[in-house]
Amino acid sequence: MVGVLALQGDFEAHGRMLRELGADVREVRVPVDLAGLDGLVIPGGESTTITLGIEREGLAEPLRELARSGTPVFGTCAGMIMLDRAHLGVLDIECRRNAFGRQIRSFEADLDIPGIDGPPVRAVFIRAPWVEVCGEDVEVLAAVDGHPVAVRQGNVLVIAFHPEIAGETRLHELLLAQAGERMRLTRPRELGRAS
C-alpha cells in the first residue's frame, strides 16, 4: 500500500499514476492513514497550505517517524520543501522556494537521473524550489544551472519538478520498487503465506 499525502496539491494525479502502475493507493489526511504503508508520496502544491494542514491534523511527528522507519518517501516540488530542515527536518537540506521565479517562469528540461534507465526524465518546473544547502549524506542526482533539483538521502527521494504533469512514470516506478523491496524484507512471512 502506497500513501499519497492528500491535504492540498496534485495528490489525485499522483494517486492515479500509482494506480495505473498497479499500486494500491491510500490518500493520507490524518495520522491513522499512515499505518501499514510501504511507501509515501508528498506531492507538490502550496507549501504554506500543506504545512498548516500537517499541523492542523497532527501529522508532523507521524510523518517524521514514517521516514525514520526506512519507509520509502518521494516528495515532489512542495514535497521537497516539506521534507527539508526548516519544515519536517527529515532531509539534511535547505530549500529555496520559488527559486526559478514565479509561475510565468515555468519551464521544462530533460534530466539524466542515476538509476532511471532510458531517455532523460522530462521535468516540468512550476514555481519550483531548488536545494540551497546539502548535508554530506545527501546525494545530488540532478541539477539545473548548478542548483540541485533532485536529491536522495537514504530512503527519501525529493525532486523540484512535477513528473505527474509530464506523464513521467519512472520515478513513481522507482518508489514502487523500493516499497516492494521493503515489504519483502520486513514482512517475509506474511508474503510467504499469501502465495
Positions of PLM-derived features:
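N-terminal beta1-alpha1 cap of cysteine-dependent amidohydrolase-like domains
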Residues: M1-R56, E65, T169-E173, A177-S195
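Cofactor-binding loop segments of dinucleotide-utilizing enzymes, especially the Rossmann-like FAD-
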Residues: L7, A78, F161
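Glycine-rich nucleotide phosphate-binding loop and flanking beta-alpha elements
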Residues: F11, S47-T49, M80-M82, E132, ...
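Short loop/helix-cap segments at secondary-structure boundaries that form the rim of catalytic
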Residues: G15-L18, D33-G36, L83, V133-E136, ...
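Hydrophobic anchor at the start of a short beta-strand
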Residues: V25-R26, V73, V156
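Redox-cofactor binding/interface segments in oxidoreductases and associated redox assembly factors
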Residues: I42, G75, I159
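Cysteine-nucleophile active-site neighborhood
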Residues: E46-D112
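Amide-donor transfer/coupling interface in amidating biosynthetic enzymes
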Residues: N98-S195
